Regions:
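Peripheral terminal and linker regions in Fe-S/redox and tRNA-modifying enzymes
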Residues: 26-666
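N-terminal chloroplast transit peptides
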Residues: 1-22
């Protein structure tokens, strides 16, 4: 049995044993009082990936050597894991492999796109890159980032450098570091709703506060030179002083103006806040590492932060390692910790988990508390068993009160309890909206996030539409957490131009999109994802058509259900939060999850394993019949209904039910 031991507030001396679900935590000890550090951290046993990170010299080797070898089209296993920190995954097309061909290795790039914000000029660069070096499409991720698929090894350096020269980056897209920071996709900017402006500020701070400090990125991709371009999201940090206080925010609209006058100031005080040492062990000694927060082995596992405002759960805030909720009075934020969805079929020590409310933090303390949470995960997260390395397992094992005490020890002060918040609601922000600053924004549905000019009569020409919209109206883009896209900075006179372009390029207005499609998400899965066991993105449209036909058959044609699909249990499309989810568990089967909330506030439950694609109507029909006939009121959602009844009652009913719906051709 493994033990996690810590002293917090000078009083917690008892060892915290593993929880009764058998979750194993690596042995570690950090002795703290609020006043001072009392003893060093005991060294943990490291798994192979942590050993690789430690030996890499801050993310350099053996990647440098493998990339220099252009005689091969692939890289070694160690470089494969190291390359993730640089924002790329090596992939091969399994369908080609199945045909007996040699592996056709290629690389996927994932950009860091804080808050999903993408200027039109950056989109044009990405469009050119996917046309000339990729597979002629782009994909919006569920964390508001871009992915470019199909890059060859010989082109990696050119493509990544071009992205950096455009004012973006792939650093922070992947790896055991802070990944893309999420934010509601609504570019609201008015004095009646200042919370959104403040949330943008804190999202940009989170994105910059945890940037890796190694020079490996510039050495490998830019020949050691510092590029002159500015990362556009930094302008949301700019204040009248170096306090990062959002009350001092300056409204910088122009990237060019920011670059000319203010970029160096922001860089300087972000560096100051990053390295500011309170003497309680957050910052590592310079003699030990070039990474003041991460250290030589970086974090035990990926780390995710989402920022939102009270009531707006468009980002799935409860699935993040840290959720930051701007309070309505703008005095501070509520901090949530310990969310995460990845799990493994048949392994009960892995599970999906929603974040818990930990504390209210006033504005002046936010950067320090965020650093303290990351430092706790750095020092106490599991580095021996990678499947249990996420922060959620540490919070689960310690309990929220003990975890909060540990954060307080690093922070050097006690934290207030979280404040009451508004009820949550989910919005995808599609359709037309007033931004509040004299401009409009318009959300366009993108099925499964794939930006492509699709083949076929009346098929959407999304790439051409976006290029023309940017060219004709000067609009910018925001990538949404539901894999759709927001056109922003639209002048009212250009609304008719956007409408005309939508018609020209076969883009449906949101009113014409089936709610099942609008609410759905899927991961890419086959053929490129090495973890996928079955289809997701390519099959979900067919599955939605079948479900709509089933609802019509049951005289439920007006119903909406939030549906998600993944090709494996790792949870990239956040299936466990959905009302109805299909989680791949076999070549032609899915584990059926039900009972998530329409407001995305709880994890659903596993209802049935190995549901065959060919007979999915028979699995769903009795559930829909119960929902139709037994709900408490006409507006009780499917997720709330099955959650209220529970698994046993559902199974009891379905055991004696004879389906009537015809099976579709799978």
């Amino acid at each position: 049995m493994y033990v996690l031991r810590c002293l917090t507030l000078g009083a917690m001396t008892a060892a915290l044993m593993t929880s009764n679900n058998g979750l194993r935590m690596s042995t570690t000890s950090r002795l703290y009082s609020i006043q001072e550090r009392e003893a060093p951290i005991q060294k943990q046993k490291l798994d192979k990936i942590n050993e690789m990170k430690q030996a890499s010299v801050n993310l350099r080797h053996p990647l440098v050597e493998d990339l220099a070898d252009l005689e091969t089209i692939s890289i070694s296993h160690d470089s494969y894991n190291l390359l993730k920190f640089h924002g790329s995954y090596q992939q091969d097309d399994r369908e080609k492999r199945k045909k007996g061909q040699e592996k056709a290795f290629q690389f996927m790039l994932r950009l860091k796109v804080p808050s999903g914000e993408c200027p039109g000029a950056v989109y044009n660069v990405l469009d050119d890159l996917c046309e000339n070096y990729g597979q002629k499409d782009l994909r919006i991720t569920t964390r508001q980032a871009w992915q470019i698929h199909g890059i060859l090894k010989k082109d990696l350096k050119h493509v990544i450098r071009t992205i950096m020269e455009a004012g973006s980056t792939t650093i922070g897209g992947c790896g055991d570091i802070n990944r893309n920071v999420m934010l509601p996709p609504a570019p609201i900017d008015d004095d009646n709703r200042p919370q959104y402006r403040v949330a943008r500020h804190w999202a940009a701070v989170c994105a910059e506060l945890f940037v890796p400090q190694t020079e490996a990125f510039s050495e490998i991709w830019c020949d050691g030179t510092k590029l002159a371009s500015v990362q556009y999201w930094k302008r949301h940090i700019y204040t009248d002083n170096d306090s990062l206080d959002p009350a001092q925010l300056k409204n910088i609209k122009s990237i060019e103006e920011f670059k000319k006058n203010d970029e160096s100031q922001v860089d300087n005080f972000i560096q100051d806040w990053m390295r500011r040492d309170n003497g309680h062990g957050i910052i590592l000694p310079k003699s030990e590492t070039t990474e003041p927060i991460y250290g030589e082995t970086y974090l035990p596992r990926k780390f995710k932060i989402g920022v939102t405002v009270e009531g707006d759960n468009s980002i799935d805030v409860y699935i993040n390692d840290i959720g930051v909720v701007v309070c309505d009075d703008l005095s501070g934020v509520n901090i949530l910790v310990g969310g995460g969805l990845g799990r493994t079929h048949g392994k009960q020590t892995t599970f999906a988990r929603t974040a818990q409310e930990m504390a209210y933090v006033p504005n002046e303390q936010i950067p320090q508390v965020l650093k303290a949470i990351v430092a706790v995960q750095r020092d106490h997260g599991n580095r021996e068993i990678r499947a249990n390395a996420r922060l959620k397992y540490l919070v689960h094992t310690l309990g929220i009160d003990a975890f909060k005490s540990l954060v307080e020890a690093y922070h050097g002060a006690s934290l207030d309890p979280p404040r009451p918040m508004k009820p949550w609601r989910y919005s995808d922000w599609l359709g037309w909206h007033d931004a509040g600053d004299g401009t409009l924004f318009c959300g366009i549905n993108v099925e499964q996030g794939r930006i492509r000019d699709f083949d076929g009569e009346n098929a959407p020409q999304l790439r051409s539409f976006l290029k023309d919209a940017i060219k004709n109206t000067g609009c910018d883009l925001i990538l949404s957490p539901s894999q759709s896209i927001i056109l922003r900075n639209i002048q009212p006179d250009d609304k008719k131009n956007i409408h005309a372009l939508m018609i020209q390029h076969n883009i449906l207005p949101v009113e014409a999109v089936d709610p099942l499609t609008r609410l759905s998400m899927a991961c890419p899965a086959l053929p490129l994802c090495g973890l996928a066991v079955t289809e997701a993105e390519r099959y979900l449209p067919t599955m939605l058509t079948r479900i709509r036909a089933l609802l019509d058959h049951l005289s439920m044609n007006r119903e909406e259900v939030l549906i998600r699909m993944t090709g494996c249990p790792n949870g990239c499309a956040r299936p466990y939060m959905a009302e109805l989810a299909f989680v791949g568990d076999g070549k032609s089967s899915y584990q059926l999850y039900i009972g998530g909330s329409p407001a995305l506030t709880r994890v659903g439950f596993a209802y049935k394993d190995r549901c065959k694609v060919a007979s999915i109507e028979h699995d769903l029909e009795p559930l829909f019949i119960m929902w139709r006939d037994q709900r408490e009121h006409p507006y009780e959602s499917f997720g709330d209904f099955v959650h209220r009844l529970g698994k046993d009652a559902l199974l009891q009913f379905t055991a004696s039910y004879t389906p009537t719906a015809p099976l579709a051709t799978a």
